[in-house]
Amino acid sequence: AEGVGLAANQVGVDLKVFVFDCPDADDQRVTGVVCNPVLRLPEGDARQLDVHDEGCLSLPGAFTECARPDLSWVSGLDEAGQPVEFAGTGLLARCLQHETDHLYGTVFGDRVPEKARKKLYKAHEKLADGYPADWPVTESDFE
């Protein structure tokens, strides 16, 4: 797929697992697999919101501004069942939050004001026919 992260339930797999390949705020590429993620966010004065356009492979081509904390940590297990923890800044912080949300039934459109959400879904409807029916993972991903 063409995104920075993908949750298992986005491709019909009923497991609490996500994968990511995403740069952090310093443009350092970070990759990983997280099973049964537990997300931590800064609190109090340490909590700073970052407002940027966000998209989703479940809503291909549609983007809207979404406010999220600029730092996040996720812990869980890797693909071998070993404990793992990732600290995210910049886009990586957003990715860790976004993918964990998917696994707990929240899509990023749920995190934006109603007016923005309506525009997001309308934009997606206009673009949806341009994507294969098996999006976000297509047969070509396995060739």
Task: Give the positions of each predicted feature.
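Positively charged
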Residues: 1-143
